[in-house]
Amino acid sequence: MRQAVRQAIEPESMRLVIPSQSGAVSPPPAGQPKPSVPPAPSGGTGKEIVVVLHEQRVYAYENGQLVHSSLASTGIARYPTRVGQFRIYVKYLATLMSGPGYYLPNVPYTMYYSGGYAIHGTYWHSNFGRPMSHGCVNLPTAEARWFYEWAPVGTLVTVRA
């Protein structure tokens, strides 16, 4: 099980970043396929993060409008990313993650949404667009920061196959 004690950020002390409507969706890096149509959010108002495992991509929606997107690396076959609907329940600027076969100090911009499953920055690989993790949603650090600053505790996280 991952350990998580470090710098917790309370929702009221977080800086909110509102992205612009133009250019907010980041293009995939060279050689990576661009999804043909972004997935629809679950509906309703407010903010939602949608993780699409077969695309290895994460989407940010606000009031049903796509505002940002990034490539990701999710769980490998042995440690799959859990599918379902969850809510971010705690955020850390940096945290220690460890388990069988890994010890990762200072994992940046970590947002836990289900037990030990989290969306976070990744400094130990840059192989985004392919499953690489022990179940978490790995993002490039700059992208993780964007999601971290945009999504408060309580944000809906939908993980789809």
Regions found by a protein language model. Give the residues of each.
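Cell wall/extracellular polymer interaction/catalysis modules
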Residues: 1-78
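Generic alpha-helical secondary structure signal
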Residues: 63-65, 90, 116
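Exported/periplasmic cell-wall-interacting domains
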Residues: 23, 28-46, 76-85, 92-161
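General beta-strand recognition
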Residues: 57-59, 87, 118
